[in-house]
């Protein structure tokens, strides 16, 4: 392993909850997912991950993993994104990842429209838009502690702070 590669590995180990062996296994998994050998995973390749293709939030997951917004996921983004799903990841870090799912425009806040869009992805056609909007409005009213019409991370955390969120954000990829 070259100096650059070992520095990347070191950074990944520091920035995630994965050890060297887990990162190596995930690298092999990444290479299998990268069907065209481009060194990145595109949306179609991402959707072949078990548990992702059937997830109603698959498109949002892709966007959150794709930190630089270029439409593909490189190995570092893959590892960083998967780290949120590790059983070793703290509840706080899992909540930060969940917050990113809702924060579509990446401005550090969840607005009414963003909450509606993500919840619509989850409920699909099971609720009429009017019913869903009522739920979104009620959620925003209850969670928006400072009354600015949007949720910051602290408000989001307080609204969803429960063991079920952390356990729901655990995925066995290794």
Swiss-Prot record:
Remarks, miscellaneous: This protein has four functional calcium-binding sites.
UniProt key word Calcium: yes
A Pfam family reported for this protein in Swiss-Prot or TrEMBL: EF-hand_7
GO BP annotation list: regulation of cell morphogenesis
InterPro entries assigned: EF-hand-dom_pair, EF_Hand_1_Ca_BS, EF_hand_dom
SS bonds (residue pairs): none
Protein name per the record: Calcineurin subunit B
PANTHER family membership: PROTEIN PHOSPATASE 3 REGULATORY SUBUNIT B ALPHA ISOFORM TYPE 1 (PTHR45942)
Function description: Regulatory subunit of calcineurin, a calcium-dependent, calmodulin stimulated protein phosphatase. Confers calcium sensitivity.
């Amino acid at each position: 392993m070259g100096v650059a590669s070992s520095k990347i590995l070191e950074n990944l180990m520091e920035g995630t909850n994965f050890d060297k062996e887990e990162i190596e296994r995930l690298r092999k998994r990444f290479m299998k997912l990268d069907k065209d050998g481009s060194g990145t995973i595109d949306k179609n390749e991402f959707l072949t991950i078990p548990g992702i293709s059937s997830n109603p939030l698959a498109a949002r997951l892709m966007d959150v993993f794709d930190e630089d917004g270029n439409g593909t996921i490189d190995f570092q983004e893959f590892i960083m994104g998967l780290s949120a799903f590790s059983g070793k990841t703290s509840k706080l870090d899992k909540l930060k990842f969940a917050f990113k799912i809702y924060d579509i425009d990446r401005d550090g806040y969840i607005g009414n429209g963003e909450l509606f869009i993500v919840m619509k992805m989850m409920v699909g056609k099971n609720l009429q838009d009017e019913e869903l909007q009522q739920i979104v409005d009620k959620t925003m009213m209850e969670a928006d502690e400072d009354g600015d019409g949007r949720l910051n991370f602290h408000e989001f955390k307080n609204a969803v702070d429960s063991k079920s969120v952390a356990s729901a954000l655990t995925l066995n990829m290794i």
